[in-house]
């Protein structure tokens, strides 16, 4: 048992036998819990272990203070249980308009390796942006928006009560069942396939499209920035897959071949690190049919590149990936994500530059034609 879980159990907040989490006890004893958790600083923060939400909140605050010239913490919304949702914006000052890369982790509560990767990604960018020419190049024209834990209520619940909880924690059917699958709640052919209207089910799609406060917060923000977002990345586990749209239909997005090409290159970069094999394809083709996913919704609103990463492993440990695998998982995934970002960057700015060259050539041709008439 983890030290924090031992503490919660001994304090009576983790009730044995699956009876649940006593919120009143948690509130009254929070101060005791805080004192019982070993003190840490950003310098000693380990990226090789899983962290409870309280430590992730503190990490976000401290990292935005230490690297304040590059990263800022921003309020996004609140969860059903009124926990604040924050994202980190990594940005270098620039006189030019910049495009956006979005990354979220932890939409499914039990997939702990996903928030671990979001933290790893932020750490790697911040520690290396001055010395790594590739990262410097990306930051000249791109801002990174990172939401380390989307499903905060569910994530906390996996630490206190049920390690394999998937959904959010909103009550339904007069409190007889809890939670919505937030990755079935987006407005992308909502609840048409691979989702359930029964609130007892793992894939309960909610009471309507974007019915949950967590999905509303994300959808509202993404909608407001959609014209500037080049790439939408949502990190999951497990299965070792890079998934493209769509899950709700066998039809493909207009740039499907290009997305597969970028995804396959990323899978190759990932494999080169430790030999881990990833498959690339649309969700409907290589995983299963599903509707209401954030990936499909992002593509439907016009974001050109949208991917789901299903991280390690392929089923041996499943959602309970050992901490010994955090570092290699994050290192190889970092290679894949940087490959995607390099390709997206090159495709956008190459086409933009090509467009400017074509326009300039046409203008020059018109000027020459006009001068010949004089």
Curated annotation (Swiss-Prot):
Residues 49-344 form the Peptidase M14 domain. One of its GO terms (biological process) is proteolysis. Detected in enterocytes of the ileum. GO terms for molecular function: metallocarboxypeptidase activity; zinc ion binding. The active site is at residue 310. It holds the Pfam family Peptidase_M14. One of its GO terms (cellular component) is side of membrane. Zn(2+) binds at residues 108, 111, 236. Glycans are attached at residues 132, 174, 187, 251. N-glycosylated. Its cofactor is Zn(2+). Residues 1-20 form the signal peptide. Strongly inhibited by potato carboxypeptidase inhibitor, and the chelating agents EDTA and 1,10-phenanthroline. Also inhibited by compounds with multiple carboxylic acid groups such as citrate and succinate, and to a lesser exent the amino acids aspartate and glutamate. Not significantly inhibited by benzylsuccinic acid. A lipid is attached at residue 352 (GPI-anchor amidated aspartate). It is a lipid-anchor; GPI-anchor. Keywords: Carboxypeptidase, Cell membrane, Glycoprotein, GPI-anchor, Hydrolase, Lipoprotein, Membrane, Metal-binding, Metalloprotease, Protease, Signal, Zinc. Its EC number is 3.4.17.-. Residues 353-374 form a propeptide. It is found in: Apical cell membrane. Carboxypeptidase which preferentially cleaves C-terminal acidic residues from peptides and proteins. Can also cleave C-terminal hydrophobic amino acids, with a preference for small residues over large residues. Belongs to the peptidase M14 family. This is Carboxypeptidase O. The gene is CPO.
